[in-house]
Amino acid sequence: MTAQTIDGKAIAQSIRTQLKEKVTARKEAGKRVPGLAVILVGADPASQVYVGSKRRACEEVGFLSRSYDLESSTTEEQLLSLIDECNQDPAIDGILVQLPLPEHIEESKVIERIRPDKDVDGFHPYNVGRLAQRIPVLRSCTPMGIMTLIKSTGVDTYGLDALVVGASNIVGRPMSLELLLAGCTTTTCHRFTRNLEQKVRQADLVVVAVGKPGFIPGEWIKPGALVIDVGINRLEDGSLVGDVQYDVAAQNASFITPVPGGVGPMTIASLLENTLYAAEQYHDEA
């Protein structure tokens, strides 16, 4: 068996095309375009790349894009003050603060300062709580994008044994909640997990997000399993690889995401979807 590749790039482009059409329809109906504020603190090269991609995607679909590039010496109070301004700005539907932040700024305080109805990253405790209670509104972008990828395969998730490797607040934990909502029997693995190999071998659906190249050997993948690789790791030769040993895993899996071109583009597509959702559900005038 050779796995079918889930083309995240093509699916994300399709979503962006649909969003562009919706923005055009909004303008024709006399409504304003959705607005996204993107805040970057410091000059982390990876963060600069991510932020650049998000801003370009915004402009491509016709959103208003506000950019705030702050020095790494920016104080926590200055950042919170900027968030307050964006919270009050009626042209802004979504606020994104690129993580990680410099060490002197407390991430949880920043995330909680963003109004829940403008939290298009889906990190605010209110939005995570909504997902936990099975009434999601603004959902975490990477898990949301992954669910779109899974749906694209046509695989029925109800009753599947799903395994999430990695328990971060950004991917692993909300991903486990999304899979529960999709009817999976879900196990979350982390650094204290014992018998990881045994758990992977039993899983019908595996999502790996640990940030370690080739962390899951391909031969561990159960024949016919669906594999979602969230990892993006740059090797010394400059090539990008995922957290799963792709070549061997692709011989066992029924569907697999490539790296690059799998999950990455979907995260940005989901961010755009959330921004339009916030505009329509929360901020449009009745």
Curated annotation (Swiss-Prot):
Q: Which InterPro entries match?
A: Aminoacid_DH-like_N_sf, NAD(P)-bd_dom_sf, THF_DH/CycHdrlase, THF_DH/CycHdrlase_cat_dom, THF_DH/CycHdrlase_CS, THF_DH/CycHdrlase_NAD-bd_dom
**Which reactions appear under catalytic activity for this entry?**
(6R)-5,10-methylene-5,6,7,8-tetrahydrofolate + NADP(+) = (6R)-5,10-methenyltetrahydrofolate + NADPH; (6R)-5,10-methenyltetrahydrofolate + H2O = (6R)-10-formyltetrahydrofolate + H(+)
Under which pathway is this protein filed? One-carbon metabolism; tetrahydrofolate interconversion
Listed EC numbers: 1.5.1.5, 3.5.4.9
Q: Which Gene3D superfamilies match?
A: Leucine Dehydrogenase, chain A, domain 1, NAD(P)-binding Rossmann-like Domain
GO MF, one example: methylenetetrahydrofolate dehydrogenase (NADP+) activity
| Coiled-coil ranges per UniProt | none
NADP as a keyword of this entry, yes or no, is yes
One GO BP on record is: methionine biosynthetic process
Q: Which UniProt keywords apply?
A: Amino-acid biosynthesis, Histidine biosynthesis, Hydrolase, Methionine biosynthesis, Multifunctional enzyme, NADP, One-carbon metabolism, Oxidoreductase, Purine biosynthesis
Q: Which Pfam families match?
A: THF_DHG_CYH, THF_DHG_CYH_C
* Family as reported in the entry's similarity comment: Belongs to the tetrahydrofolate dehydrogenase/cyclohydrolase family.
Q: What is this protein called?
A: Bifunctional protein FolD
**Which organism does this record belong to?**
Shewanella woodyi (strain ATCC 51908 / MS32)
